Amino acid sequence: MPTLPDLRAGILGAWRTNNRVTTELIQRLPPALWDLSIPDVPRRTIRAIAAHLHNSRCSWLRTLGREHGIPTPARVDQRGVPPGKLVAALKRSSAGMEALLALGLDDERLWIAHFGETRRL
């Protein structure tokens, strides 16, 4: 079984990789595709789905991070956010999510509250 430092490094490393792949995909997406509708879901564009990722993170941060002092970034407009602004917003929400993950990994009280013991995975 991995020790706590291994678990912490693995989870935070996986988060950073996920965010990097997401932001690079958005940066490299051809502009012609940005506002295309998803087949059979005409109200959902690639822009809207990408913005939803950031806005969902904001919801998690507001719900779980506020009481721990983790700031919630501003949400973005799913219909109008330009790619560059979305990438900047994703970087802010990623930093918050990383702080939230670190909080959960580092706070023994949270482990006890959720798992009933201090034994780490």
Which role does the model predict for each range below?
Residues 1-121:
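Aromatic-glycine hotspot motif
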